[in-house]
Amino acid sequence: MSSTTSTINLSSLGSAINDVLNIIVQYLPVFVTVAVLFGIITYMTGGLGGLFSGITGIFGS
């Protein structure tokens, strides 16, 4: 009885993981595009130092 329950739990866990992986694969191009755009913007604004100084400048003013 207990072995059957654990098997059901494992299979439902596996399908849940499969669903999550499917969602990640679906939205992967979006994440990559956002990451690339953010990287380009960061590079154009003078790297992370420029980004952080820009943020602190906005809050400082």
From Swiss-Prot:
Q: What cellular-component terms does GO give this entry?
A: host cell membrane; membrane
Recorded topology in the membrane: Single-pass membrane protein
| Coiled-coil annotated spans | none
Q: According to the UniProt topology, which residue ranges lie Extracellular?
A: 1-20
Main localization of the protein described in the UniProt heading: host cell
Compartments, as annotated in UniProt: Host membrane
Q: Is the Transmembrane keyword given for this protein?
A: yes
Q: Cytoplasmic topology: which positions?
A: 42-61
Superkingdom, according to UniProt?
Answer: Viruses
Give me the segments passing through the membrane: 21-41
Keyword terms: Host membrane, Membrane, Transmembrane, Transmembrane helix
Protein name from the UniProt record: Uncharacterized protein ORF61
Source species of the chain = Acidianus filamentous virus 2 (isolate Italy/Pozzuoli)
